[in-house]
Amino acid sequence: MIIDIVGAGALGLLYGGKLLASGNQVRFWTRTTAQADLLSHDGVTIVEQDEEIHILPDQIQAKPISELTDTWKNTPGEWLLLMVKQTSIDDFIHEISPLQDHVLNIACFQNGMGHLAKLQAALPKSLLCSAVTTEGAKRTQSEVTRAGTGETRLGKYNIHIVASTSIEEERTFTLSGSLQQAGFDCTVSNEIDKLIYRKLLINSVINPLTALWRIPNGELIVKEERKRLMRQLYDEVLLIYSASGICLDQDMWDQLISVCRSTATNTSSMLADVLTGRGTEVRSINGHIVRMAQKLDLVAPTHEILLHLIEGMQPEGVN
């Protein structure tokens, strides 16, 4: 199967490298030519607890994203795994807009919300799947270290509005099977919206606070003052979800604390962005919570304050 990986960061290389090692043809698409050349020159090594996978330079197909459209028209891929951050979605849509009349199968791995509606408007004939994953990885120049074994769940975007056709279901199960064969715990879910809102809640609490205090995830729960602010953010989301008819598990607070424990040494993606001076996904995470509240004539004051605080931490000119 030909699989396109857009975004050659830690997760993109983890998924792409393992899919390549299990027999798929994988094409990596990077932001710049220099990034593609570096990947093609160095190859990549994937480090796991019990093995290392060495992807040699001559096995790597890497090109800048600007060449994706022409390449895809000549040799269509069967699936495209979109692994860029929310802040790069508009650039991706710009690059792929010439394919708006084609049918692409796209699995979207983004945090936060808002990107799927944008993509559906830009690519109305394509199949969009949400991918919710607890996989984590860290990258050095040519090495990716997998942070334990997570779960990946796939589901069609807006399945509660438009049911999947048999062909769409078959395509989604094919991708799930390929990911399983590559060593990922992947299943197809009919409750993907619930999983998305669960992850949004967790990210809206953990990400901004770790970025603000510059601490790993586990440090959030070692002081009662921090847990009180976590609970305030959590309660605001639950009120908004309840008004929106979104139901989560009764033990959601315990699940949130458990995530902090199980990822205790992890640096959240938002903290990593702040430390390196990159734009964050706060508008798509806490900003989305604020927008949900506004549509319901409710307020999310703590989320709104954190939204402005994190945006204010970004360097001038970075969005």
Go through each PLM region and give its residues:
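Rossmann-like NAD(P)(H) cofactor-binding subdomain of soluble oxidoreductases
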Residues: 55-143
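Rossmann-fold dinucleotide-binding core
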Residues: 109-195
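Active-site-proximal catalytic alpha-helix in oxidoreductases
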Residues: 193-221, 225-238, 265
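NAD(P)+-binding Rossmann beta1-loop-alpha1 motif at the extreme N-terminus of oxidoreductases
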Residues: 1-55
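Hydrophobic anchor at the start of a short beta-strand
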Residues: 3, 25-27, 106, 128, ...
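NAD(P)-dependent Rossmann-like dehydrogenase/reductase catalytic/cofactor-binding core
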Residues: 231-319
